[in-house]
């Protein structure tokens, strides 16, 4: 399995984006610091590891691992699985694609933010916020990968 990584910047934190791939699964690893990691439009597995990370899965059926630290996860469309790990994490399911995402928040005080009537399933989330499609679109545009 080939993994292609494009390092965008290294200034106190690592920002990484994977090269697009439709025919294979891309695996992306973060560092012990505060990383910004982004997947492709295909299926990705992203391991953020330690640090307060921002993880963007983009389109495709993705698996996102937050690790230690206060992480923020933004999966895209598709059937996505998010594991928050330790820390106070924020997991999103805002794609409005009617897919059964899984949000496993983990230890810490974690928040899941989803579109109302989304079929997402939750585990270990202390707070679940349900937004209207309009509110979700505005939030995704302001902080997610639109």
Region roles according to the model:
Residues 138-146:
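Composition-driven, intrinsically disordered low-complexity tracts enriched in small residues
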Residues 94-136:
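Leucine-rich solenoid repeat scaffolds
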Residues 1-7:
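Bacterial N-terminal signal peptides that target proteins for export
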Residues 30, 39, 48, 57, ...:
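Glycine-centered beta-turn/loop sites at beta-strand termini
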Residues 17-19:
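N-terminal signal peptide c-region/cleavage motif recognized by signal peptidases
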């Amino acid at each position: 399995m080939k993994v292609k990584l494009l390092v965008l910047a290294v200034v106190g934190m690592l920002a990484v984006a994977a090269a697009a791939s439709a025919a294979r699964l891309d695996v992306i690893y973060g560092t012990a610091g505060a990383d910004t990691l982004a997947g492709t439009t295909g299926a990705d597995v992203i391991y953020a590891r330690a640090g307060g990370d921002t993880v963007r899965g983009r389109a495709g059926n993705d698996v996102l691992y937050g690790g230690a630290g206060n992480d923020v996860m933004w999966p895209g469309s598709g059937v996505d699985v998010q594991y928050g790990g330790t820390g106070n994490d924020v997991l999103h399911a805002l794609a409005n694609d009617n897919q059964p995402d899984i949000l496993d928040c983990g230890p810490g005080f974690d928040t899941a933010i989803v579109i109302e009537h989304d079929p997402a399933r939750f585990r270990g989330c202390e707070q679940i916020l349900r937004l209207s499609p309009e509110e979700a679109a505005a939030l995704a545009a302001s902080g997610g990968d639109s």
